[in-house]
Swiss-Prot record:
The lineage of its organism: Bacteria, Bacillati, Bacillota, Clostridia, Eubacteriales. This is Gamma-glutamyl phosphate reductase. Pathway: Amino-acid biosynthesis; L-proline biosynthesis; L-glutamate 5-semialdehyde from L-glutamate: step 2/2. Catalyzes the NADPH-dependent reduction of L-glutamate 5-phosphate into L-glutamate 5-semialdehyde and phosphate. The product spontaneously undergoes cyclization to form 1-pyrroline-5-carboxylate. Transmembrane segments: none annotated. PROSITE patterns: PROA (PS01223). Its main location: cytoplasm. It comes from Clostridium beijerinckii (strain ATCC 51743 / NCIMB 8052) (Clostridium acetobutylicum). Its EC number is 1.2.1.41.
Amino acid sequence: MSELIIKGQNAKNASYDLGIASTKQKDDALMIMAEELIKAKGDIISANKIDLDAAVLKGTSKAMLDRLALTDERIESMAAGLKDVIKLQDPIGEVISMWQRPNGLQIGQKRVPLGVIGIIYEARPNVTCDAAGLCIKTGNAVILRGGSEAINSNKAIVKALTKGIERSGLPKASVQLVEDTSREVATEMMRLNEFIDVLIPRGGAGLIQAVLKNATVPVIETGTGNCHIYVDKDCDFEMAKNIVINAKASRPSVCNAAEKLLINEKIVEDFLPIVVKALRENGVAVKGDEVSQSIINDIEKAAEEDWGKEYLDYIIAVKVVKDVDEAISHINKYGTGHSEAIITESYKNSQKFLQRVDAAAVYVNASTRFTDGSEFGFGAEIGISTQKLHARGPMGLKELTTIKYIIYGNGQIR
């Protein structure tokens, strides 16, 4: 019997007890998990250094190293995140609606856990803690499979978390880590229908596509973020520049960072030099189409494959468009359904953009970086769903539940 099947069986068994745990039991567990995380800070940072040293030797990019790195502050933030989940309302047991049929049956909808959640992700060890906290709060057992880049960090984090879970009296197998990071085991996990109720991949396009191609377990796609900002002809240049810089340069390795900049042809000669100067001052390399190159001749030419690429780095590609309609067409062709923004003072164009752009989050005069559970007021999130079934956009606690129908009768037969 493989390690994964054993973990699957243990998770399924744990999910039954965890699913009926009280809010107080779950909140107590989260508090103790946070305490154990802080106690293990030294061990976690030592383990993370092993991962970072290996990543540097492999020539990993600066942006990806930032994703991988753990510091005192980041671990304290992870612990604080667990405590923040305590403050969120527990959705489990909520009766959403109740109605009575003519025959006297009373029918209701009640929120219940999904059961066992599998999460496959890459070099972001903070996901390990975030996912564990959200799953505990919603009564779901979780099987975590992180990338090989962060395996030592993840082991240390899960060791601390499971110590806290065990101390709280909840099943230790509520949170488990798959320590074999081979593709074969990942594929086996994608097909573990007997034990895993839903699979959530978090990572780049390659990982997402591999899961969609191989999984027989139902998948919630947390898609890649090829996010666009369209700067309309009627806009405040200073606002537009500041939004572009924030969306691209504040943290380029995350999925809600802007990857493409579309500029209306009527303002490009005036606006492009301003924004390119600001981008370069923030360390961002700029690629562009032929029109962009004709205005600033040292811009690198953007190839066709650039338009659909998620860089996750200090790179942005610029395209000049005729109007809002061409911008919308380009976004709907190359976007990934994540987050898209228009900078405009035109109400008409803003409404057209909101209605026609097909994405989970569509912005008017704001940075795409706000697509985040905490920024939306949901608290922590498990990921940003770019699909339309079950969940779309930031996935908070309610998105980790399903519906059970409860029916009360007094002897009715059909």
